[in-house]
Amino acid sequence: MARPFAFLMVLVVISYWSTCSLGCDLPQTHNLRNKKILTLLAQMRRLSPLSCLKDRKDFGFPQEKVDAQQIQEAQAIPVLSELTQQILTLFTSKDSSAAWNATLLDSFCTGLHQLLNDLQGCLMQLVGMKELPLTQEDSQLAMKKYFHRITVYLREKKHSPCAWEVVRAEVWRALSSSVNLLARLSEEKE
């Protein structure tokens, strides 16, 4: 009788530990995918940023929502998922396809889709474990507003090559922030 009871206790402890730990396990390849996406986005550049200085704009990236020093994993994953989804939506629009090399754009969007799948799997783990913080909704709304400003800008500029170059550079900065955040979260787990 003692052995089945001990076995049941081990199962309960393992179950409790796996559901109460804050972390979620992103695949080892996630950081590599992030870096590859940044490389692809850099390769997509068609114009010198200097030739588009007149078109530059501050879109108000919500840096505090991805600040590696202030955010916890339970807050970070939903924000990073929203960021990735918004970038994917932006670059899969019909107006986007005319602006970029088709092969690079396809590879970039495929990589984003893989990242999004990783993040959404992680998000499902977090949702299953506990209630997510209320600040998550504020953070996701901040990301949506940020990308709305980008979309309006592109429309106002009639999706000009310079407008897309400004947006490409802006998205590169946003993705770089997300890579830094994920790196910090990975370090904390070790």
From Swiss-Prot:
Which residues are modified by glycosylation? 101
Could you tell me one molecular function GO term of this UniProt entry?
A: cytokine receptor binding
User: What UniProt keywords apply to this chain's record, in alphabetical order?
Assistant: Antiviral defense, Cytokine, Disulfide bond, Glycoprotein, Secreted, Signal
InterPro entries per the UniProt record, alphabetical: 4_helix_cytokine-like_core, Interferon_alpha/beta/delta
The record's subcellular locations are: Secreted
Family to which the UniProt record says this protein belongs: Belongs to the alpha/beta interferon family.
Its annotated function is as follows:
Produced by macrophages, IFN-alpha have antiviral activities. Interferon stimulates the production of two enzymes: a protein kinase and an oligoadenylate synthetase.
An example Gene Ontology CC term for this record: extracellular space
Q: Which cysteines are joined by disulfide bonds?
A: 24-122, 52-162
Q: State where it is primarily located.
A: secreted
Kindly indicate where the leader peptide sits in this chain.
1-23
The reply on keyword Translocase is no
Q: Which organism is it from?
A: Mus musculus (Mouse)
Q: Which GO terms describe its biological process?
A: defense response to virus; natural killer cell activation involved in immune response
Designated name of the protein: Interferon alpha-9
